[in-house]
């Protein structure tokens, strides 16, 4: 066991799963969050009753809402919604040492600035080493000790080794890559494609259509990676095709479920990362004058006046059909 203190910011399912991994390898693990129910249940019962009520946690995990817990941390993992990232950092940054590695476990793009999460962190904590953890992982499977794989993207191999030693177990594996930007844009983009997959499954589009969508999505992903100066080869990593498949073909994915229920008038204000990410990616494509057909089509669908009405499904079908024809460069059969 490594003699170091680790802090996970965020007491949701993924943050809790990460804390439990760290607890196998590090001396003390603290979850920093605001929810008193989560804090009390972890400290008193060693369980997160709000998000993961059936999974007992390692007993060297504690939880607190006190910011000063960050002062002694050697590793800080951040697992909070992307749109609250900057506000959080501004509140806690005075408690974070410059020598601490920051590991981002969230996926998204800041809506106002169109910055990736690592870019937001760099603005607020310019001296800290930043890593991104991303891969095809559901929290409950990680906690169930099912073999799981992630990329850990960063630009300092020595720091990677330190983080990997703290995080890796017999069933959780990390692979080092240096493409921080590509890793993040793929993590954001796959949420948009998952919404489209949910729509298509709800409309009984079939396996042929869904498989073709994956090919088209990978091409569109290249465009966004280029915008953010990433490496297109990252598409073939766990954080790329691996995460895309997991998120797009499982009804456990919140974004897939959102797309599935969207046809029936599910609230467009639903708290899914794909919703805000969609708006950000649409704006990025517009600014850089790149025709990202899938992203733009889904954005158009969410703006329909027919939203929640009986004609909404037909409007969706028309837009998706038009998008596929456009991507294939062919005209609709008479």
UniProtKB/Swiss-Prot annotation:
Gene Ontology annotations of biological process type: carbohydrate metabolic process; glycerol-3-phosphate biosynthetic process; glycerol-3-phosphate catabolic process; glycerophospholipid metabolic process; phospholipid biosynthetic process
Localisation per UniProt entry: Cytoplasm
Record: active site: 190 (proton acceptor)
GO CC terms in record: cytosol
Catalytic activity of the protein: sn-glycerol 3-phosphate + NAD(+) = dihydroxyacetone phosphate + NADH + H(+); sn-glycerol 3-phosphate + NADP(+) = dihydroxyacetone phosphate + NADPH + H(+)
UniProt keyword list: Cytoplasm, Lipid biosynthesis, Lipid metabolism, NAD, NADP, Nucleotide-binding, Oxidoreductase, Phospholipid biosynthesis, Phospholipid metabolism
Keyword check for NAD: yes
Keyword NAD annotated: yes
InterPro entries found in the cross-reference section: 6-PGluconate_DH-like_C_sf (IPR008927), 6PGD_dom2 (IPR013328), G3P_DH_NAD-dep (IPR006168), G3P_DH_NAD-dep_C (IPR006109), G3P_DH_NAD-dep_N (IPR011128), NAD(P)-bd_dom_sf (IPR036291)
GO MF term list: glycerol-3-phosphate dehydrogenase [NAD(P)+] activity; NAD binding
Membrane-crossing segments per the record: none
EC annotation from Swiss-Prot or TrEMBL: 1.1.1.94
Pathway: Membrane lipid metabolism; glycerophospholipid metabolism
Chain's role: Catalyzes the reduction of the glycolytic intermediate dihydroxyacetone phosphate (DHAP) to sn-glycerol 3-phosphate (G3P), the key precursor for phospholipid synthesis.
Classification via NCBIfam families: PRK00094.1-2, PRK00094.1-4
Family, as annotated: Belongs to the NAD-dependent glycerol-3-phosphate dehydrogenase family.
Protein name, per record: Glycerol-3-phosphate dehydrogenase [NAD(P)+]
Organism: Neorickettsia sennetsu (strain ATCC VR-367 / Miyayama)
The encoding gene: gpsA
């Amino acid at each position: 066991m490594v003699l170091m203190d680790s802090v996970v910011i965020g007491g949701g399912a993924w943050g809790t799963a990460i804390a439990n991994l760290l607890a196998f390898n590090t001396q003390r693990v603290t979850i920093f969050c605001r929810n008193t129910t989560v804090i009390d249940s972890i400290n008193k019962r060693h369980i997160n009753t709000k998000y993961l009520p059936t999974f007992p946690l390692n007993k060297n995990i504690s939880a607190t809402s006190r910011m000063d817990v960050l002062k002694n941390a050697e590793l800080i993992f951040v697992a909070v919604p992307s749109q609250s990232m900057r506000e959080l950092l501004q509140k806690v940054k005075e408690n974070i040492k410059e020598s601490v590695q920051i590991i981002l476990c969230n996926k998204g793009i800041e809506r106002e600035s169109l910055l990736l999460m690592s870019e937001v962190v760099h603005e607020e904590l310019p001296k800290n080493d930043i890593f991104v953890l991303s891969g095809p992982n559901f929290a409950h499977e990680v906690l169930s000790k099912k073999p799981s794989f992630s990329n850990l993207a960063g630009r300092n191999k020595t720091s990677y080794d330190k983080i990997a030693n703290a995080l890796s177990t017999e069933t959780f594996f990390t692979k080092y890559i240096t493409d921080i930007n590509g890793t993040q844009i793929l993590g954001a983009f796959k949420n948009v494609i998952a919404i489209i997959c949910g729509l298509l499954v709800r409309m009984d589009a079939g396996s042929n259509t869904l498989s073709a969508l994956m090919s088209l999505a990978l091409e569109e992903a290249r465009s966004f990676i280029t915008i953010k100066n990433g490496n297109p080869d990252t598409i073939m990593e766990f954080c790329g095709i691996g995460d895309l498949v997991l998120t797009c073909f499982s009804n456990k994915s919140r974004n897939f479920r959102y797309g599935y229920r969207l046809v029936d008038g599910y609230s467009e204000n639903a708290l899914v990362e794909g919703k805000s990410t969609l708006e950000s990616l649409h704006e990025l494509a517009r600014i850089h004058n790149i025709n990202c057909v899938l992203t733009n089509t889904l954005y158009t669908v969410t703006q329909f006046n027919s939203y929640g009405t009986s004609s909404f499904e037909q409007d969706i079908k028309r837009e998706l059909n038009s998008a596929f024809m456009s991507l294939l460069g062919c005209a609709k059969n008479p």
